[in-house]
Amino acid sequence: MPFLSDNRTLAAGAVVANVLDGKFNRVLQENSKVTVAQVCDGDVASTIIIGRELLMDDQLTLIESVAGGSPRNPEDIIAQSVGRAGEEVIVKVRNTDAANAQTVKTNVYIEPL
């Protein structure tokens, strides 16, 4: 089961088009169930797309329950769907805070069907 993760600090007002950019398994190798878990330490909005399916559109991400904690499965799942071989998984993040940097942590679980 492929696993992708990302941990980054976003500058105030920053946008990252796809936190999975450059990771091999962001493009599905076969039909798969895709699960995205994410936490942040402040005001971060996320957009999640699998292929042509928009699962989450610029919605606030869960605040981490444990300071410095990583996303937990199943507690911090924010989206889950099935994608087809060749489709790309996109997780866009945006710091909605105009004054402070925010940390966002993302885990993506890919389970072939």
Predicted regions mapped to residue ranges:
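Beta-strand-centric surfaces of beta-sandwich/beta-rich domains
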Residues: M1-L113
